[in-house]
Amino acid sequence: MKLFIQTLGCAMNERDSAHMIAELRDKKHYTLTNDIKQADLILINTCSVREKPEKKLFSEIGAFAKEKKAGAKIGVCGCTASHLGEEIIKKAPSVDFVLGARNVSKITQVLERPKAVEVDIDYDDSTYVFASSQGMGIKAHLNISIGCDKKCSYCIVPFTRGKEISVPKDLLISEAKKCVASGAKELLLLGQNVNNYGVRFSHSHPKTNFTQLLRALSEIDGLYRIRFTSPHPLHMDDEFLEEFASNPVIAKGIHIPLQSGSSQILKMMRRGYDKQWYLNRIAKLKSLVPNVGIGTDIIVGFPTESEQDFEDTMEVLSLVEFDTLYSFVYSPRPHTSAFEYDKSMLVSPEVAKERLARLQNLHKEILSKKAQLEIGRIHNVLIENHYNGEGQCWSEGRSSSNKLIKILDKKCEIGSIVKVEITHNEGGGLMGRFINELSLSEALASKEYFQNPIYIQEGALC
């Protein structure tokens, strides 16, 4: 039997899809297909963080229903499934079952139940996260927690994924070792609020925090890098920052969601910090790791956002000079406190879109400047892809600080670690020259993120 799966949204959804694929392969003997007309089972793993993907869902269901072969089943999974539940089947009778984000481990059970709806956000089966860690190549994903307790005023995730529960450390270490034994060089730790790890465990467990987990995982033989997403700024204490800086296995690229640079808007968002607190944490981080790569999320057009509020956000963008930016216009979501705001508090779509364009244009200018400053710098690159044919030869991978670097005229083995000098950039993309290949021990000892010239201005963020 054949499975077609469409995954929308975040890395957590990608991981959930990988789990369902493995469950269906191992227990029901399904194989993947990219041709929907051949599929016996069609899964749509959905996202509900913004309204647009939810609206698009029903048109996609209709299209799939027309294309599918007779007898093929359609299942809707993920956060939109948690949010809308039975409403999905009422609006789209061609859907055979609905499976919430917290319930993906039940995928093989619901197949035989007509019009099954499983959307229990309190369901606790944290062991499911291990079902498909192996065989993922040089980069493996590992869920260390599920759910979120934060209740930010704009975010529907606590409603769709439930309360926060951490996976016991010994289980994580055991699974991480299996990933490395299967060829993984890099682990991506996943959690809705990943650095709040340890707040609540699925069963009795000694007290452990995120920093202690990172330290334990980094001791696994053969592991080159650990990345994680997404942390919350509030849990970036000094113990964590010092471990992040000093531990060579922890990649020196980090995503730190800002959401807004306005202290007033941050208060309305229930983020728990203000503009200056955020900047102080960034200043501390950059003092420890000068060339750290920092990504962020920003929402523009949040209710009551004034021009000055927006300018505060632009100022933070200019000061921090984020390496990656995920930016969106505010999308009101049911089951959030911001959804109840009076319509008079909303920013007009025209103003919000104009602000988003200004924000993104400023970020493009920042990236262009930073790309020029990279020329001549040395990075250790974990090779993720290569190509040799039709008169072209190149390899591609990421540095510790998460910079995507293309190496021209050299085919490097996927999974190898190579030293690269940045020679130029094309359209903001970094191009480099192969210097030499490194052993794992050589790469961990070189600390390329300290060897490069520092381009931040001391005290600029204080």
Swiss-Prot record:
It is found in: Cytoplasm. One of its GO terms (molecular function) is 4 iron, 4 sulfur cluster binding. [4Fe-4S] cluster 1 binds at C10, C47, C79. Keywords: 4Fe-4S, Cytoplasm, Iron, Iron-sulfur, Metal-binding, S-adenosyl-L-methionine, Transferase, tRNA processing. The keyword S-adenosyl-L-methionine applies. Monomer. This is tRNA-2-methylthio-N(6)-dimethylallyladenosine synthase. The lineage of its organism: Bacteria, Pseudomonadati, Campylobacterota, Epsilonproteobacteria, Campylobacterales. The gene is miaB.
